[in-house]
Swiss-Prot record:
It is found in: Cytoplasm. GO terms for molecular function: ATP binding; pantetheine-phosphate adenylyltransferase activity. Keywords: ATP-binding, Coenzyme A biosynthesis, Cytoplasm, Magnesium, Nucleotide-binding, Nucleotidyltransferase, Transferase. Belongs to the bacterial CoaD family. ATP binds at S9, F10, H17, G93, L94, R95, E103, V128, R129, T130, I131, T132, A133, T134. Gene3D superfamilies: HUPs (3.40.50.620). One of its GO terms (cellular component) is cytoplasm. It holds the Pfam family CTP_transf_like. InterPro entries: Cyt_trans-like, PPAT, Rossmann-like_a/b/a_fold. This is Phosphopantetheine adenylyltransferase. The gene is coaD.
Amino acid sequence: MTIAIYAGSFDPVTNGHIDVLKGALRLADQVIVAIGMHPGKKPLFSFDERVALIEVSAKAVLHKDAARVSVIAFDGLVIDAARKHGAQLMVRGLRDGTDLDYEMQMAGMNGTMAPELQTVFLPADPAVRTITATLVRQIASMGGDIKPFVPVAVAAALNTKFKS
């Protein structure tokens, strides 16, 4: 069985993340969405909220394939989380050349530390290429319409966060 790990902060999960997740499911039997926990960062959504939003969004978009997705937390190196969960592939989404430059550096470092783990780059669909979680949070905080950029449940959760 092929297991892929897809790591990020997912604060919040966006349509771009879901696009990468769909691509990962075409490559692997099981995809682990690994939410990085950084003690120095204060995310908008708690870990439990992010797990719930990823799971609800996956079910809404992926239907029966959502059963092939699990969500975990990790702190430290993603290669350690990948090893712990038996992943052979590390999936990374690419929006543009800037992402590619950064991800190539990371793939090189990860490849040196974990040669058994293959990094796979998935180019973003043009329809979601401009979406970032940071921009989504900024737009939502200013009362803008974020529905084109995030799953329905995420839009509702963001609207609730910024109305309170």
